[in-house]
C-alpha cells in the first residue's frame, strides 16, 4: 500500500474526528468503567462508507496472525491487551507484571459481566484476517503492527472470550453482536477503522453496514 495514500487518509480522519481523544494509559484503574474511543457519528460513518472502495474480498492465502505483531508493550510492563483490560474494566487491580488480578468487565457484545480477566478476549473490531483480505496483505510489518495494536481508533475492546471466538474473522454481513443495542456503535466503529486504514469492503458487507447505519 502506498504510504502517501494511507497517511493522507489518516489526516482526513483526524480533521473530521478532532473531537475524539486518545484513551491514555492509567497507572491506576478508573473507579467507573472507561471505554474504547468513541466511534464517529452515524452521519460521518455514512459519509465514510460511501467513500470506501467496494470490491470482492481478497484471499486469505499467506495470512498468519504472526504477520500482525501483537501484543506490544504500551507503557511500563503493560502490553496492549493489559492496557485495554485496565481501560475497559472497573476497579481493575494488576500485579507487578501488569496482569489483571481482579476487577469487573462488562462485555458490550452480549451484555455479560465478568470478574476474571481470563474470561475475556481483546477483540479486533476489524479482524486481522479480514484486514488482510481487504488490503493489509500489501502493508509493511510496521503498518500491520500499528493496526493490530491501535488504541486510538475504536478497534480494540474487551469482550466475552467465546463470543469473540464465535465472531472469528467474520464481517458484519455474517456476524453482529447479539446485544442489538450495541450494533449501531459496532458498525460505526467498523466503518471508521476501515476508512482510516484505507481497507476495502465487499458488496454484502456494505449492504449490511448501510442497513444498520440507516437505523442509527
What do these predicted ranges mean?
Residues 1-35:
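Secretory targeting and sorting signals
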Residues 54-128:
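Secreted/periplasmic proteins that engage bacterial cell-wall peptidoglycan
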Residues 48-52, 66, 83-87, 131, ...:
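Residues that form generic nucleotide/phosphate-binding pockets
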Residues 105-216:
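Domain-level detector of nuclease and nuclease-like folds
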Residues 25, 32-75, 203-207:
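N-terminal module-boundary/linker segments of secreted carbohydrate-active enzymes
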Residues 19-20, 86, 134:
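Alpha-helical transmembrane segments and their juxtamembrane interfaces
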Amino acid at each position: 500500500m502506498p504510504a502517501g495514500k494511507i497517511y493522507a487518509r489518516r489526516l482526513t480522519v483526524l480533521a473530521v474526528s478532532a473531537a475524539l481523544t486518545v484513551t491514555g494509559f492509567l497507572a491506576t484503574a478508573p473507579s467507573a468503567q472507561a471505554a474504547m474511543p468513541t466511534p464517529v457519528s452515524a452521519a460521518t460513518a455514512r459519509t465514510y462508507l460511501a467513500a470506501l472502495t467496494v470490491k470482492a474480498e481478497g484471499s486469505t492465502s499467506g495470512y498468519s496472525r504472526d504477520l500482525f505483531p501483537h501484543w506490544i508493550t504500551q507503557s511500563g510492563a503493560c502490553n496492549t491487551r493489559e492496557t485495554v483490560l485496565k481501560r475497559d474494566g472497573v476497579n481493575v487491580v494488576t500485579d507487578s507484571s501488569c496482569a489483571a488480578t481482579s476487577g469487573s468487565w462488562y462485555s458490550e457484545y452480549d451484555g455479560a459481566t465478568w470478574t476474571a480477566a481470563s474470561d475475556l478476549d481483546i477483540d479486533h473490531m476489524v479482524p486481522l484476517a479480514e484486514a488482510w483480505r481487504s488490503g493489509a496483505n500489501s502493508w509493511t510489518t510496521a503498518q500491520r503492527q500499528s493496526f493490530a495494536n491501535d488504541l486510538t481508533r475504536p478497534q480494540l475492546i474487551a469482550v466475552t472470550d467465546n463470543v469473540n471466538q464465535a465472531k472469528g474473522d467474520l464481517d458484519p454481513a455474517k456476524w453482529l453482536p447479539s446485544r442489538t443495542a450495541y450494533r449501531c456503535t459496532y458498525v460505526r466503529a467498523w466503518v471508521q477503522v476501515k476508512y482510516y486504514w484505507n481497507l476495502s469492503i465487499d458488496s454484502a458487507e456494505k449492504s449490511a453496514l448501510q442497513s444498520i447505519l440507516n437505523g442509527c
